[in-house]
């Protein structure tokens, strides 16, 4: 009878009201790395790195790029005859140079500081081409016969459209020629000149005459003087001679003076920079140019994103994310995603004391599950969830600001220095990128660890808040759950959730129920002890009886001799 009562009471206790603290889980398979772990599955995360692109060139701020087509930068800017379609004023958002372009420097030679020139041209947005030194500037010399088969046009010999190859006339010696140009405008002027180096003395004498020859150029900020270097060289493009090509900038208010008595490749047409930008670019690519608009253009294509970083290309123009070498910069915003195991039931942790998250709780990160006579259900704790959301949002913005500060520091450092030093900065940029990439990855790993720890702490805090309210009015089940010693209807459950639980109100009922359960447990323990003693004694008597019976049987059939001595 006592055992039946115990079973009945325990069964009733199994249907007691309960409340559990838990956290959100979902079907996400997204994984992040932390400073201590790799491939941690989380409920929510944000990828800071863009890696998708549209493989085409578009307009930037409604301004089209300049397609050099079959010409190189050198061929266009010097005026290769095959690049006549590019003559005239030009404007662009950026310049596209094709890797297969063949029309560059036609008469063999080297353009001095070409990379710096490309950086300068890339920073321009609009240029006006004008005649700087008309042919009439140079008297007593031939300004029309300086052509070469190396620079053909319409099957005949020609020369660069922006340079003038000056040679002596057949009837007179090459006299000293002089020219001057004063930049009275407000824009800087890009101009070119060259020095011809014949392969032998015969060609030198034929073109310029015998004797020492020189080319001199000078402004308020530049001085140049060079004499021809006559030497035998291998043929390139059918020519054994060479031309050294030079360029410079004539600043507003400066005057360019030219003087030569031979071997001068004189400036003819020049470019006036009407509009410049510090964010220009020259892209070398075969991507098509299409009638489209973009805010971010890279050499690899268009980016359309609101992400902070990209790993598509370090060469870009427009409003683009910063480039890093990382494959991913995924920042955790949610919790570890550990959905509960069905066989373990509902009650069960993050933080070491709840075994799994709740996929049924969808309106918050942390919350409750209750069970009473009126039913059961989930409810999110909106206050702790909102605080966590705000904190993580601020964290994401803070990380972005920290990374942007790293990137912008060096740019500001070089912004007011000469272009040559700025170019050196670009060459060093790859090394800076390694450091920035490492810093970005390390920062994300550290913040991911902190985010998961934050969620852990928030669940624990919620658990401790409930525990401090219930005290001994509920039994701790040890898995994030509490079993009430009293009846707790929906109103009671709500008071626990919102922190207004009235402990004294339920104290007496809880105490009484707790004592009854403990009493039944003690009585049931006594019954079990009596049954255990009875069972032990009974088993011993049966065993002794069996031994005696076997002994008598063996004595009766002679298998064992029995002697009784008195």
UniProtKB/Swiss-Prot annotation:
Gene of this entry: HA
Location(s) in or outside the cell: Virion membrane; Host apical cell membrane
Disulphide bridges, residue numbers: 20-481, 58-292, 71-83, 106-151, 296-320, 488-492
Gene Ontology biological process terms in this record: clathrin-dependent endocytosis of virus by host cell; fusion of virus membrane with host endosome membrane; fusion of virus membrane with host plasma membrane; viral budding from plasma membrane; virion attachment to host cell
UniProt site positions, description: Cleavage: 344-345
Extracellular side: 17-529
Principal subcellular localization: virion
Post-translational modification: Palmitoylated. In natural infection, inactive HA is matured into HA1 and HA2 outside the cell by one or more trypsin-like, arginine-specific endoprotease secreted by the bronchial epithelial cells. One identified protease that may be involved in this process is secreted in lungs by club cells.
Glycosylated residue positions: 26-27, 39, 182, 306, 498
GO MF entry, a single one: host cell surface receptor binding
Described function: Binds to sialic acid-containing receptors on the cell surface, bringing about the attachment of the virus particle to the cell. This attachment induces virion internalization of about two third of the virus particles through clathrin-dependent endocytosis and about one third through a clathrin- and caveolin-independent pathway. Plays a major role in the determination of host range restriction and virulence. Class I viral fusion protein. Binds to sialic acid-containing receptors on the cell surface, bringing about the attachment of the virus particle to the cell. This attachment induces virion internalization either through clathrin-dependent endocytosis or through clathrin- and caveolin-independent pathway. Plays a major role in the determination of host range restriction and virulence. Class I viral fusion protein. Responsible for penetration of the virus into the cell cytoplasm by mediating the fusion of the membrane of the endocytosed virus particle with the endosomal membrane.
Pfam families hit by this protein: Hemagglutinin (PF00509)
Similarity-based family: Belongs to the influenza viruses hemagglutinin family.
Keyword match Glycoprotein: yes
Gene3D superfamilies xrefs: 3.90.20.10, 3.90.209.20, Hemagglutinin Chain A, Domain 2
Protein known as: Hemagglutinin
Segments on the Cytoplasmic face: 551-566
Signal peptide span: 1-16
Lipid linkage positions (S-palmitoyl cysteine): 555, 562, 565
Species assigned in the record: Influenza A virus (strain A/Shearwater/Australia/1972 H6N5)
One Gene Ontology cellular component annotation held by this UniProt entry: membrane
TM helices/strands, residue ranges: 530-550
